[in-house]
Design a protein with these regions (language model features):
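Active-site loop immediately N-terminal to the catalytic Tyr-X3-Lys motif
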Residues: 92, 139-143
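Residue(s) in the substrate-gating loop at a strand-loop-helix junction
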Residues: 132
């Protein structure tokens, strides 16, 4: 079902990140009123965002408060989660702290966001999670990262069925490697040499176009 974004209230979690900022900008350009949930509001683009709430996504209580805060200003029509962390290395190099961090940010946090926002999102709205291509095409040397993203993808797929009666689209976006610089900020390991990825602006534009068009899934092929 196609949707109009003009005047709609969309919450972008991670709007200070490279990709999150571009998504917020494209949403604003499409006429949406964009709220941000971030850890550091000083890095926000004031031209794209009209309000913000502070939260670390691995703090479920803070996430709940943040969603309630932005919803108190205007009903929520959609949510986009653009947060994530990455790690590299073989399975023998994986330590407990890295494993816990990957699943906390990439799997548990999106599920908590969906739990806290599901009752706040208006019927006919949407929730977008960026899991990435590794969710369905796991990569050697990135086993835990791939698994954490696959867990989020599975949850999004299940909840999409739960919210179908309310016509809420739960969209899992699985773009290929994107030049966000995330690989240089890995929580562990060193990134292997990668081919040049997509630009963040191209990925952000495609995601916003999918929201407007009412697409329900964005596999890697959708970014070709």
């Amino acid at each position: 079902m196609a949707r109009e974004l003009v005047g709609k209230h969309v919450v972008v979690v991670g709007a200070t990140g490279v990709l999150g900022a571009r998504i917020a900008a494209h949403l604003a350009a499409a006429g949406a009123r964009v709220s941000a949930i971030v850890r550091d509001h000083t890095r926000l683009d004031g031209a794209s965002v009209f309000q913000y709430a502070l939260a670390d996504v691995i703090d479920s209580a803070a996430v709940q408060i943040a969603f309630a805060s932005v919803a108190s200003v205007a009903p929520i029509d959609g949510v986009v989660n653009a947060t994530g962390v990455v790690a590299f290395g073989g399975i023998s190099d994986l330590d407990d702290a890295t494993l816990a961090r990957l699943f906390a940010v990439n799997a548990t946090a999106p599920i908590v966001m969906l739990r806290e926002s599901a009752t706040l999102i208006a019927d006919g709205g949407f929730f977008v999670n960026l899991s990435g291509v590794v969710a369905t095409q796991p990569v050697a040397g990135m086993a835990a990262y791939s698994a954490s993203k696959a867990a989020a993808w599975a949850a999004m797929s299940a909840v999409a069925r739960e919210l179908r009666r309310r016509q809420i689209d739960v969209i899992d976006a699985r773009p290929p490697h994107t030049e966000t610089g995330l690989a240089t900020r890995a929580v562990a390991g060193v990134a292997p040499k990668m081919p040049v990825g997509l630009t963040p602006d191209v990925v952000a534009a495609r995601i916003v176009a999918a929201i407007i068009a009412g697409e329900r899934d964005l596999p890697v092929e959708a970014f070709a």
